[in-house]
Amino acid sequence: LLVLSNSEIATVTGISGAGSFEQYIQYTPAADAEIVSNGKLKTIGVMSDAPSGAATPAVLTRAGLNLSQCAHFLINSGLQIVPGVPYYDLRAKHGYDIRVRPGVPDAPEIRDASRRLAGCCDCDLAVIGETIPGGTTTALCVLRALGYNANVSSSFAANPTALKEKVVREAMYGASISPGSLRDDPMRAVKLFGDPMMPCVVGLTEGFLNSGKEVLLAGGTQMGAVAAILKELNLSDDVVLATTKYVFDDASARFIELVEALEIDAFSAYPDFSKSSISALQKYEQGEVKEGVGAGGAMTLACISGYDQDAYRQEVEAVIKQL
């Protein structure tokens, strides 16, 4: 399942690299959804690649799904621009600027609707990914409100940590909230400082666990923040995280420290794009993009299906060439 969301925080200059051009950044989730579903763009003629020219992680996810032959399902949880492919609409509002108002005022409704949706899904394993520009900043703010002195990753090679911390300080000061003060009220942390992806994934996870399904959260530090919420709700015991080596190895993200603090199982997919002839893929080895669109989970599914690094890389290259 891929959760599609937008947040006004993505429009803070320099905070997100999820899109080729800043003026099109809110189109990124819709473009990612179209690539994952159809392998081609319909809504916008501009690729959702990073400003550096690194390929969108949507191509990594598309390749993993092609190889594993796993079904996928798109969920609109607060989009401003909708994709030209089928999706389930939660009728959620997009995320607001957490510095000036609550980020997700409809968080309880999103959680409830998502929990009901999960109850209607027939599967053994639910792999849940996300695409939301600016999501690492809202993740950082929620983690701080819950009392985790963690860092988050970035789609940029050079993580703009100072800018993210500034946004977090302004948001928490404006809401008169101190670090750790919302540990016993995680959904209030989501409502004040989160984005629409978070209550959706929380609700989906809750619904799947209630019906005896296994849940794999496909993502890095953003899914780490969701795992922190689940932990405080006593829902994290049967949840696993799967991300890419680029997040695991990112010293600025301190992902392993977060996982250890959460006491949750996590593992990493290890692609190798250094052999690729496509420069947009080679940039992953230089620290660009790292994760997103459930890429780590899709790679894991390809691995479970018996495909090695070379086969996976070749499939990603084929997806890019078809675009």
Annotate each language-model stretch with its function:
Residues L1-G129, P133-L323:
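N-terminal loops that bind phosphate or other acidic moieties
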